[in-house]
Amino acid sequence: MLKKILPVLITLAIVHNTPTAWAAEAPKTDSFYLPKSLDLSPLRLHNIESNPYGKDFNYAQQFKTLDLEAVKKDIKTVLTTSQDWWPADYGNYGPFFIRMAWHGAGTYRIYDGRGGADGGQQRFEPLNSWPDNANLDKARRLLWPIKKKYGAKISWGDLMVLTGNVALESMGFKTLGFAGGREDDWQSDLVYWGAGNKMLSDNRDKNGKLPKPLAATQMGLIYVNPEGPNGKPDPVAAAKDIREAFARMAMNDEETVALIAGGHTFGKAHGAASPEKCLGAAPGEAGLEQQGLGWANKCGSGNGKDTITSGLEGAWTTDPTHFTMQYLSNLYKHEWVLTKSPAGAWQWKPKNAANVVPDATDPTKFHPLMMFTTDIALKVDPEYKKITTRFLENPEEFKMAFARAWFKLTHRDMGPAARYLGDEVPKETFIWQDPLPAANYKMIDSADISELKDKILKTGLSDTKLIKTAWASASTFRGTDFRGGDNGARIRLAPQKDWPVNDPAELHSVLAALMEVQNNFNKDRSDGKKVSLSDLIVLGGNAAIEDAAKKAGYNISIPFTPGRTDASQEETDVSSFAVLEPTADGFRNYYDAKRNTLSPIASLIDRANKLELTVPEMTVLIGGLRVLDVNSGGSKAGVLTNTPGQLNNNFFVNLLDMSTKWTKSPKAEGYFDGYDRKTGKLKWTASSVDLVFGSNPELRAVAEVYASDDAKEKFVHDFTKVWEKVMNLDRFDIKNN
């Protein structure tokens, strides 16, 4: 699935040893010549053509035919089959694969839902070449024989997470379970990872704050710098960075400690020599003959005892391939002093350190224990210290905390449990999954649907209010982490019911009327049928659009599939849902300047991208919603029609009408007034989001299609098709079956 795309703020061009003469002839994007031009590529990347499996491919159905136990058996074989081209530390690739899975999932961030294991983006640039992902290219190559064997039945995203799970289990740790369902992407996401274009540059602003939506503190890191902030070995400052970075990745203090302590129970760091002196280019800049691998090491054997990854060197425990309590006991048993690795990186060793850690390649050699600055932070920070000491004194509690945190880390970006596939899905549900109750009643049929639509239209609610409510409910969906949407009817719960964009007072009255329809239908039935409020919200929007089309002379019927259920307030984490609040929604001409870093137009592209829309879909949706008069706050900006409430192509006709002259409005920035060229009379008002469909050449090209005389009916049908798509974005129960 091509998702999680944000308009490119910085273009990074990586050229594979291309001669200068060729590079000079390389085509450039519009933004190269016109830096202010609008980048619509995020929306074009939703086109299915880039998927080599084709438009009819259903990954969920493929995964259901997979013999998961056979895959796990093959993974276990790979774990202990050391390859000469990249030998396994201690004869076991387990710790290496845990790092691969962790770093694949750990890019997730709560503010925009981007990052995470879904999509298998670790395979692509820039993540493939991030310094924090050094040598993970080899981990994936070790897994290629398994991916090759099972092909379309298991995605890279699923395989990497499953391998991390199997690695943990093979080394004596009991995981909580595993869910498949991560569909692979087929090209790099265009994600804003920070303002700098230099790896390890500080992501903080001039005031030392980490701007939203970022989570990693430095460019090219998954979380924080293990040596300390910007390489300074200050455990107190490191604790502050850890807390902020992990919180932005949906982890609380206890989950953070469990993940670090659990993960650092295994394996070792690699810093046999200076990366600057020994390592070649990252995969994205390596020569063609490297075949996608990077960081070629010219020092010593180039691997094994000479391996260089982070520049830090050593292990946290004396038994790096088994789950033990040693990480925590070592943290408190020793007095740790600052030192440097052979590569010159800051790290810590026990005072009067003894050589107790077996060498990763030579069992006759031993080394001192090691800790990162970020490990010492868990001992010096007061809150982290409380948790680490409690875990040390209660091993079973620590094991369960790590199991839960690991499952959350590797599944957080998958969205609701309805997307989960396989026999190892935990029976327990978690609040971070945005749980939904199961329907314990019969679904409504086509006759009931017709009856309910009629009753909704007879409530006295206007078409506009019904459409606004359905849009407000469904458009919270974001395809970046599959959260939000209408299912659950959480629009009636905190925090959504109070969001300014939803016009709370008006929303309350609409929901009250719909709940009355629901109660009247559900009460005293003998046939076992019921209808949920979430189904009624969508059904009300559909009925209103059909009515608006009828007023314009078109008879349409929008397909509807019941099955949504209603969540409770107890099943809704208010703070977690708060990040879904639209501070800008161009589809409703809403923009909160105080809470946005993107422009209104860029915000529109971002929201359309999260709704998995293409350029034509976004365009026709804007045109329809404008004439249906659904702007937030009742704004008339962009309502370019004399028949508001009728579904027609007037928005495009009037936008492209040359009898109108547009000027900047003196009343508000980002707004415009449209005057009749002959009479000078004010005809329309519009926002920058409206006018971009006449200003931008690519958007205008699509707008011209819908403004044409022969496209009136096409517009109505295209709009309703996209409307249906948005209403069903969260219907994973349908998609997986």
UniProtKB/Swiss-Prot annotation:
Cleavable signal peptide: 1-23
Keyword Signal annotated: yes
GO cellular component terms, semicolon-separated: cytosol
InterPro entries, alphabetized: Catalase_peroxidase (IPR000763), Haem_peroxidase (IPR002016), Haem_peroxidase_sf (IPR010255), Peroxidases_AS (IPR019794), Peroxidases_heam-ligand_BS (IPR019793)
Tryptophyl-tyrosyl-methioninium (Tyr-Met) (with W-102) cross-link site: Y223-M249
Binding site for heme b: H264
PROSITE patterns in the record: PEROXIDASE_1, PEROXIDASE_2, PEROXIDASE_4
GO biological process entries: cellular response to hydrogen peroxide; hydrogen peroxide catabolic process
Catalytic activity field: H2O2 + AH2 = A + 2 H2O; 2 H2O2 = O2 + 2 H2O
Keyword tags: Heme, Hydrogen peroxide, Iron, Metal-binding, Oxidoreductase, Peroxidase, Signal
EC nos: 1.11.1.21
Post-translational modification: Formation of the three residue Trp-Tyr-Met cross-link is important for the catalase, but not the peroxidase activity of the enzyme.
Oligomer and partners: Homodimer or homotetramer.
Protein name as it appears in the record: Catalase-peroxidase
Provenance organism: Yersinia pseudotuberculosis serotype O:1b (strain IP 31758)
Name of the gene: katG
